[in-house]
UniProtKB/Swiss-Prot annotation:
The keyword NAD appears for this protein: yes
Pfam families named in the record: Proton_antipo_C, Proton_antipo_M, Proton_antipo_N
Record family assignment: Belongs to the complex I subunit 5 family.
The name this protein goes by in its record: NAD(P)H-quinone oxidoreductase subunit 5, chloroplastic
Function: NDH shuttles electrons from NAD(P)H:plastoquinone, via FMN and iron-sulfur (Fe-S) centers, to quinones in the photosynthetic chain and possibly in a chloroplast respiratory chain. The immediate electron acceptor for the enzyme in this species is believed to be plastoquinone. Couples the redox reaction to proton translocation, and thus conserves the redox energy in a proton gradient.
Organism: Lepidium virginicum (Virginia pepperweed)
Gene: ndhF
Classification of source organism: Eukaryota, Viridiplantae, Streptophyta, Embryophyta, Tracheophyta
Subcellular location: Plastid, Chloroplast thylakoid membrane
Length: 746
């Protein structure tokens, strides 16, 4: 066992050869490297599989013998300072390594097909390999300096992958927004690290915790300064895990390829902030005010993310806000001191949300054959609908992921979210009400996404599919923007844009690529409607096996991964794997309880949380099930149609919620007005002062000297005698002034 731990330092470097060899190969042998591109994919998957096996082996050992292994090498710079670097293996490290490697492998398999038509295929896999190395280095770091180094590398990889299609202005702006927002958090993290080193004199986690606790117990340090340093440490995770108010970058990050959204912005990178708070929890836990701030930020993010997801039209942005809300649950659990619940939800959410993102990518991939290669159209849920019979496997996988996130048993997220809701009841009634209400909102917006995408008919080909008697309709311009138009009621179908279905554009050059034959030669389907028009249209098709296989594996994880943490304890014996891993575990809410959850309490709380979820699903079903169905006869909907006054109030409420959600809670607008515009004005004023005042003085002195020299040159007439005469005249004037000054003094 000790022999295994000695070689754990190699874990972060196993995926590193692929990006290095790809970079060298593309520089020196570009043609050969591109011709062997499938080999690089296989090599990436193979190396990450080694990491997964290694991590699984470490986890199995720690289940039976829970221990912490740390190995440190010291680099002495001088007698007063030495830099130590090494690796730190504990249950948290092994779990995160398994999570990174398993999701990473599935995303790489998925990406092989998803990115096959992109000219940046090799660049994509190089970035992915470098990201996996950075993330593994982060979770195995033994001190704060190493954490910060890999933290920055993870941010750089995120910047590169969000802006992967950098020729699109919206993607370029999105990666810059993510970079700048995370720099705010990273600066706070750096200040916190330096402050802690100034107090404790160490960067190592174990030494840091011991010294910090001793200082607190003996009152040998200013508590206010300690609190400030701890808060600055927390600012980094706020930005990285998209917590309020530094969450604004996450929805825009969806401009990157969909596999990136599944790996980085659902399962791993955004979880890095949760990981760091969990790693530093022994430090935070001795400062109650910091724990309360962590829980407060978490509960605000939980509610804000859920409300902002309510009216999103882009399927990936809706899932992004859902991710933000679920990360808020994890942060809330950590702030309450429920270490196990937070990490349990981190695991279950990672697999469920990765499944949903890969499912959305499969849908987008299928819609591109219909609406063309435009994210504004292929990701717009308003143009989807009726996909159940066209993509049945994707639909089933997406439904399982949706039910899991809603908290429906026995799926993965039910077990972890239920623990957090139970702990919130013990922590604060107000927090519990917000957390439980948000569970209902989660079920509502997730089923809204599902119903808009899969139920009804394909809305791309239909007008007036909302069922309203008088309405204006949205047509799609050539560039994917919605334009409001009044359409003729005599026509039952929206005329399609003229599209060339034999070619697919690339963002990087004018060359086009043919779409595979299974897209071109798909069966034509005739849609008859209103008796007047019979037209022939394309319909989406199921994705290829290399896209479906990772989704099916994640579906199995979503079904069964919750079993590792089912909280059934009897006679002091832990039956779940997580309890064996996290021994001893930090739990401030169950300090005096031998059995965390008994049968009666579990079923009572589970019944309550599941009832809330089903209520949210029911409301979503009533509002978003296609209006041409029999649901119009439901009493709930007829109430709003019969009572005009209540209907007006209801519509005002709906419009308020819609505007709040669609405009991102006006937070982006506030930042733009209060920060961005102010900084721009300051920059313009600084630029004016620098160029007109500072440069003006410098240039004025130079120009004055030049003119004085020119005047002197012409007065002297280019003769030495004239220069001597002027020189002596100036000396005489100077002596006269000096004489009068000296005479007046005496």
């Amino acid at each position: 066992m000790e022999h295994t731990y000695q070689y754990s330092w190699i874990i972060p470097f196993i995926p590193l050869p692929v990006p290095i060899l790809l970079g060298v190969g593309l520089l020196l042998f570009p043609t050969a490297t591109k011709n062997l591109r499938r080999m690089w994919t296989f090599l990436s998957i193979f190396l990450l599989s080694i990491v997964m096996i290694f991590s699984l082996y470490l986890s199995i050992q720690q289940i039976f013998v829970s221990c912490i292994h740390q190995n440190v090498w010291s680099w002495t710079i001088n007698n007063e300072f030495s830099f130590e670097f090494g690796y730190f293996i504990d249950p948290l490290t092994s779990i995160m390594s398994i999570l990174i490697s398993t999701v990473g492998i599935l995303v790489l398999i998925y990406s092989d097909n998803y990115m096959s038509h992109d000219q940046g295929y090799l660049r994509f896999f190089a970035y992915m390999g470098f990201f996996n190395t950075s993330m593994l280095g982060l979770v195995t770091s033994s001190n704060l300096i190493q954490v910060y180094f890999f933290w920055e590398l993870v941010g750089m990889c995120s910047y590169l992958l969000i802006g992967f299609w950098f020729t699109r202005p919206i993607a370029a702006n999105a990666c810059q927004k993510a970079f700048v927002t995370n720099r705010v958090g990273d600066f706070g993290l750096l200040l916190g690290i330096l402050g802690l080193y100034w107090i404790t004199g160490s960067f190592e986690f174990q030494d840091l915790f011991e010294i910090f606790n001793n200082l607190i117990l003996n009152n040998r340090v200013n508590l206010l300064f300690l609190t400030l340093c701890a808060f600055l440490l927390f600012v980094g995770p706020i930005a990285k895990s998209a917590q309020f108010p530094l969450h604004v970058w996450l929805p825009d990050a969806m401009e990157g390829p969909t596999p990136i959204s599944a790996l980085i912005h659902a399962a791993t990178m955004v979880a890095a902030g949760i990981f760091l708070v969990a790693r530093l929890l022994p430090l935070f836990i001795v400062i109650p005010s910091i724990m309360y701030i962590i829980s407060l930020i978490g509960i605000i993010t939980v509610l804000l993310g859920a409300t902002l997801a309510l009216a999103q039209k882009d399927i990936k942005r809706g899932l992004a806000y859902s991710t933000m809300s679920q990360l808020g649950y994890m942060m809330l659990a950590l702030g309450m001191g429920s270490y196990r619940s937070a990490l349990f939800h981190l695991i279950t959410h990672a697999y469920s949300k990765a499944l949903l993102f890969l499912g959305s990518g499969s849908i987008i991939h299928s819609m591109e054959a219909i609406v063309g290669y435009s994210p504004d159209k292929s990701q717009n849920m308003i143009l989807m609908g009726g996909l159940t019979k066209h993509v049945p496997i994707t639909k089933t996988a997406f439904l399982i992921g949706t039910l899991s996130l809603c908290g429906i048993p026995p799926l993965a997220c039910f077990w972890s979210k239920d623990e957090i809701l139970n702990d919130s009841l013990l922590f604060s009634p107000i927090f519990a009400i917000i957390a439980c209400s948000t569970a209902g909102l989660t079920a509502f917006y997730m089923f809204r996404i599902y119903l808009l995408t899969f139920e009804g008919h394909l809305n791309t080909y239909f007008i007036n599919y909302s069922g309203k008697k008088s309405s204006s309709f949205y047509s799609i311009s050539l560039w994917g923007k919605e334009e409001e138009k009044k359409l003729n009621r005599n026509f039952g179908l929206v005329p399609l844009l003229t599209m060339n279905n034999t070619k697919r554009a690339s963002f990087f050059c004018k060359k086009t690529y043919k779409i595979s034959n299974n897209v071109r030669n798909q069966t034509f389907i005739t849609v008859e409607n209103f008796g007047l028009n019979t037209r022939t249209f394309y319909y989406p098709h199921e994705s290829d096996n290399t896209i479906l296989f990772p989704m099916l594996v994640l579906l199995l994880f979503t079904l069964f991964i919750g079993a590792i943490g089912i909280p059934f304890n009897q006679e002091g014996i832990d039956f779940d794997i997580l309890s064996k891993l996290f021994t001893p575990s930090i739990n401030l809410l169950h300090q005096n309880s031998e059995n965390l959850v008994d049968w009666y309490e579990f079923f009572r709380n589970a019944t309550f949380s599941v009832s809330i979820a089903f209520f949210g699903i029911f409301i979503a079903y009533c509002l978003y099930k296609p209006f041409y169905s029999s649901l119009l006869n439901l009493t709930l909907l007829n109430l709003f149609q019969k009572w005009n006054s209540k209907r007006i109030r209801w519509e005002k409420l709906i419009n308020f919620v819609y505007n709040w959600s669609y405009n991102r809670g006006y937070i982006d607008a506030f930042f733009k007005t209060a920060l961005i515009e102010s900084i721009r004005r300051l920059a313009k004023q600084t630029n004016f002062f620098d160029k007109r005042i500072i440069d003006g003085i410098t240039n004025g002195v130079g120009i004055t000297s030049f003119f004085v020299g020119e005047v002197t040159k012409y007065i002297g007439g280019s003769r030495i005698s004239s220069y001597l005469f002027l020189y002596l005249s100036y000396v005489l004037i100077f002596l006269i002034i000096l004489f009068f000054f000296y005479f007046e003094k005496f």
